[in-house]
């Protein structure tokens, strides 16, 4: 499912796919009405967000994995003063692309993730 890159994208800038554009693509390709397409995109991201909030990993076959990682406290430094300050422990979300997605991106192929 290819999409047209807007003509207004300045040279050198990477085009960005937004949630609104995802909904528009669903509208065009699947035949949902615009409201249903927008709701489906929102629901998809809500399910992923809820799973991550509950400490679960999210695995999307052929696309990649979202995982939580706990980073321990570590020493840091104020760049202006050079003063040593601790960087607090935190939890972060990481994304690891699948081998299939990596191959599609590397080969410059039009990704058809519905396969």
From Swiss-Prot:
Q: Which GO terms describe its molecular function?
A: DNA binding; structural constituent of chromatin
**What name goes with this protein?**
Integration host factor subunit alpha
Q: Which PANTHER family match?
A: DNA-BINDING PROTEIN HU (PTHR33175), INTEGRATION HOST FACTOR SUBUNIT ALPHA (PTHR33175:SF2)
Arranged from A to Z, the UniProt key words for this protein are:
DNA recombination, DNA-binding, Transcription, Transcription regulation, Translation regulation
Keyword hit for DNA-binding? yes
GO CC terms: cytosol
UniProt subunit comment: Heterodimer of an alpha and a beta chain.
- Asked if Heme is a keyword of the record, the answer is no
State the Gene Ontology BP annotations. DNA recombination; positive regulation of metabolic process; regulation of DNA-templated transcription; regulation of translation
What is stated as this protein's family in its record? Answer: Belongs to the bacterial histone-like protein family.
Q: What does the function comment of this entry state?
A: This protein is one of the two subunits of integration host factor, a specific DNA-binding protein that functions in genetic recombination as well as in transcriptional and translational control.
